[in-house]
Amino acid sequence: WLFSTNHKDIGTLYFIFGAWSGMVGMSLSMLIRAELNQPGSLIGDDQIYNVIVTAHAFVMIFFMVMPILIGGFGNWLVPLMLGAPDMAFPRMNNMSFWFLPPSLSLLLASSLVESGAGTGWTLYPPLASGIAHAGASVDLAIFSLHLAGVSSILGAVNFISTIINMKPINMSPERIPLFVWSVGITALLLLLSLPVLAGAITMLLTDRNLNTSFFDPAGGGDPILYQHLFWFFGHPEVYILILPGFGMISHIICHESGKKEAFGNLGMIFAMLAIGLLGFVVWAHHMFTVGMDVDTRAYFTSATMIIAVPTGIKIFSWLATMYGSQLTYSAPCLWALGFVFLFTVGGLTGVVLANSSIDIVLHDTYYVVAHFHYVLSMGAVFAIMAGFIQWYPLFTGLSLNPKWLKIQFSIMFLGVNLTFFPQHFLGLAGMPRRYSDYPDAYTAWNVISSIGSMISFVAVLMFIFIMWESMSSNRQVLFPTQTSNSIEWFQNIPPAEHSYAELPTISY
């Protein structure tokens, strides 16, 4: 296990690591909602509150969503869907995983020394500078990010090599499964954006420790430069988080609809490519309040709205794939339908925020929090749940209890919506982000939001119980539920240690 070069074992390690980190991240979010449940202070001052918020973001993004979607599902499914015997660089694959536990350890250490890194996950100077955050906390967080970044870059190189070099000779680009496409595009985005983040946080590190002035106006630097560099990474990053989810949802909807391919398969591929490309030219929409020229704001507003077009193509293609089919309303199907609906809601609030003039008012309010939690907590997480339930029988050879899964879906659906829908109202009413206290006019919606978070917590506990029950009762799977449109279901269930002794013949 520790030194395994098998893509299945490494994928399983990623799943276990992601689940553990997810529990840490969820605990942090419960602390946030407990603090905000009533006006007045519960935990302490805003420094400790901001440390919790910062750690919650980092843990959920870098140690939960990315390891599960890219590391877990990517490692497990890409070689199986390509008919490849393993990844292109199996030992580097192992190293990619083992960079993550030290990275997480450094991040958790940053919260425990001095007074913690209370900067928000963006690490903006001058708040993250040596003066405002003296001590080792921010430095530890920066090293943690470096390690996570190296891990992701190595993984990205590995996936790109695998997808280009290890597919069957007659698998033309439009025949490559959509999930493999999505992971390939994700890997490309990682490869192009992470070095910029590494440069930005390295400059921040030297500003803090080696007396440089990249972001210090007193020495001729500019803190806005940091924001440009960070968001040039930060915006592609949010597409990195959702693209593998897009690929998985495409497969699940095809599978559940009994169709042989998605509606507009080529259009789906080009939509993902367009999203990946456009993701790099919209970064300053995170900075509408820093005083950019009006023509710059106009460009970033327009470019951001253009991203809604390929995203809309994907959503309507999913709907068209389901059209006319007899849906079974199985658990993966429910998660996929929930994904399509809630991701659309999150996308619509994104179009609202894309308007630079409106964003001046809504920037740094709970409206933004509601927007990105709809696309992450109900986009990425719903995709993870859908994919996990869909492929769990393939990975383990065991079956989950379908009735309990539907009940668990209902509880989770209620919980996340109750948590994040009221935050739109809080944002429109002007409640700012990253404060541990608020005027009592905001109490009602915050109470509802906190109740929703507790319901979600119960739903997650129930899911852990469903998995435990499945493994302890050991119900073997006899055959897949439906004839499938992708080749991973032709494996034994669970697959053999080495799936392909020779390259399979793919005939269409």
Curated annotation (Swiss-Prot):
Give the stretches traversing the membrane.
7-35, 46-81, 90-112, 136-165, 178-207, 223-256, 265-281, 294-322, 331-352, 366-395, 402-428, 442-473
* Annotated catalysed reactions: 4 Fe(II)-[cytochrome c] + O2 + 8 H(+)(in) = 4 Fe(III)-[cytochrome c] + 2 H2O + 4 H(+)(out)
GO terms (molecular function) for this protein are: cytochrome-c oxidase activity; heme binding; metal ion binding
Where, in this chain's numbering, is Mg(2+) bound? 363-364
| Residues in the Mitochondrial intermembrane compartment per record | 36-45, 113-135, 208-222, 282-293, 353-365, 429-441
Task: Summarize where O2 binds, as residue positions.
Answer: 239
Annotated signal peptide: none
EC top class named in words: translocase
GO biological process terms, alphabetically, are: electron transport coupled proton transport; mitochondrial electron transport, cytochrome c to oxygen
Matching entries from PROSITE patterns are given as:
COX1, COX1_CUB
Please list the residues that bind Cu cation: 235, 285-286
Where it sits in the cell: the answer is: Mitochondrion inner membrane
Q: How is the cofactor bound here?
A: Binds 2 heme A groups non-covalently per subunit.
As recorded in UniProt, its EC number(s) are: 7.1.1.9
Q: Which residues bind heme a3?
A: 371
Q: In which tissues is it expressed?
A: Expressed in all tissues examined. Highest levels in gut and fat body, lower levels in ovary and collateral glands.
Pathway this chain belongs to: Energy metabolism; oxidative phosphorylation
Q: What is this protein called?
A: Cytochrome c oxidase subunit 1
* Protein's gene: COI
